[in-house]
Amino acid sequence: MNIIPRTSLIIYLKHMKHERQIRKYGHIVHSNRQRKYVVMYINEADADNIVHKLMQLKYVHDIQGSPYKYLKKTYEKEKHEIQ
């Protein structure tokens, strides 16, 4: 079984009524009606194409990528903590 690398996008919409239309681009895991955003998981291989298609939609205000792959995942004690 292969694990497909996925990434999350935070998509800010102008109106939440368009949430249903963007379901075809990925898997929606969270939506906030007050702040008008949707958190969606997509395949990393298709990320560039999907972001390009989403930005062309009139009702998409902004798209932010997940910072997870840039975070440090192994934690070690810092030099000042050892002493």
UniProtKB/Swiss-Prot annotation:
Origin superkingdom: Bacteria
GO cellular component terms? cytoplasm
Q: Tell me where in or outside the cell this protein is found.
A: Cytoplasm
Tell me if Disulfide bond is a UniProt keyword of this record: no
Q: What is its main location?
A: cytoplasm
Pfam families of this UniProt entry?
DUF2129
**Keyword set for this entry?**
Cytoplasm
The entry sums up its family as follows: Belongs to the UPF0298 family.
Q: Indicate what this protein is called per its UniProt record.
A: UPF0298 protein SERP0712
The source organism is Staphylococcus epidermidis (strain ATCC 35984 / DSM 28319 / BCRC 17069 / CCUG 31568 / BM 3577 / RP62A)
